[in-house]
């Protein structure tokens, strides 16, 4: 018999599956709502969302994209969404700094090191919250240039906020 348990030797080490778990949870709650006859809803788990149908005013659901600032919670852009999942990934909440360099919690799978590029935040609009969540993390790991290439190849709606000096520049994929 093979023991399938995951063990860790360092007490301070942990695995954080929020890069995919929140979007998956959003979709599961949406499935439950739909099975109960709801066809107009907005589900939000930790900023990952699924917007279906219309809001109470008969419009699409308005969602604010935060400015990637560790100190505040300002809205950078408002979008209106109907029948899509939305997820944002960024380096402005979970990071550390050493010798003036910011190190993100997102790891580059090629180097095994934290990402260090200028992409501060990426928001993905996709058919499901699971897809939006996973692609936001993947694009965040890739950086702005490769992330835009992937967004175009996959036909995704993606909004980028890239660090430029003391501020940010905005760009988006054609599908956004």
Label each residue range with its predicted role.
Residues 1-176:
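Mature catalytic core of soluble alpha/beta enzymes
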